Each structure stands twice: as structure tokens, then as C-alpha cells.
Amino acid sequence: MLESLTVTPTAIIIMALVGLFTLVLPLGLGIFFWRKSKGRWRFFFIGCIIFPVFVLILERTAHSLLLYGAPGAVLQGNIWLYAFYAGLMAGVFEECGRWLAFKLSLRWSQGPGDALMYGAGHGGIEAILLAGMTMLSNITLALALNRGGLEAVEAMMGPLSETGLLA
């Protein structure tokens, strides 16, 4: 049964469209805000930098320090405590990143257009890195499955039992 896994062309096309949408929408919003509200591209790129630095680098580093060892065992042993921890960490790191971006860039701001550009950059890079890259990964796995089944995926990723994809 598992050897006959395939992904329909429609599903692959939808994944590609979602990936394309996550790339086009932020750029489209940036162009729209730039034209309509005279927002400046500097703020778009500040938003694009803040999200990966604070969430994907600093927050991930904090998780690696806190989730391994005794504190991590306590957090991971209680679903409610772990959910509280995850929400708190996400909020703290994203808001600290936004605060720093606003604190450093308010002196250059010339109105709400700049804030809109920052939001398009911050949310846009989040969409691209999380949804867009996920779609790219899903398409890669789907094509591997369609070309050679699980053997092709194992050749690409290693034994499935070690990757957590197969119980």
C-alpha cells in the first residue's frame, strides 16, 4: 500500500500556486503601498530583515537553550505549559523585533506609508519563508513520490524510519 503513494497533478499545481502567491502578494503589497501611500522601500526591507533575525535565529537559539535538559523535560511533559511557553516565546521575540525596528526607524519615518511598507516586508518574508518554502519542499517530495515512490524519497532523504516520516 505505501509503495503506491502518488500525488495528483492538481495537488502539485495548487502547491505551486500557493508558493507563487506567497511570493507575489508581499511584492504586490509593497508596490501598492509605495505608489498609493508613498511608503519607502527601506522600511519594506527592514521588515524583511527583522523577522528572520528575531524569529528564525534568536528565538530558535533560545529554544535550543531552554528545551534541552531539565527545563525542557518539564515543558515538554505538560502540554499546557508547553503551549504557554511556545506562545510566550513567539510573542516576545516577534514584538521585541518590531519594537527594535520601530525604535531605530521612527526617526526616518515620514508617515503611515512607511509603517505599511514595514508590515508588508515583515509579513511578506514570514509568508515566503514559512509557507512558500513549505510548498517548495512539498512539491519536491511529491515529485519524488511520483517518480519512484517511497524508494525515491528514501534515496533523497535517507531511511524514512529515521526521518520520522514513517512510523
Positions of predicted regions on the chain:
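Hydrophobic alpha-helical segments at protein termini of multi-pass membrane proteins
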Residues: 1-167
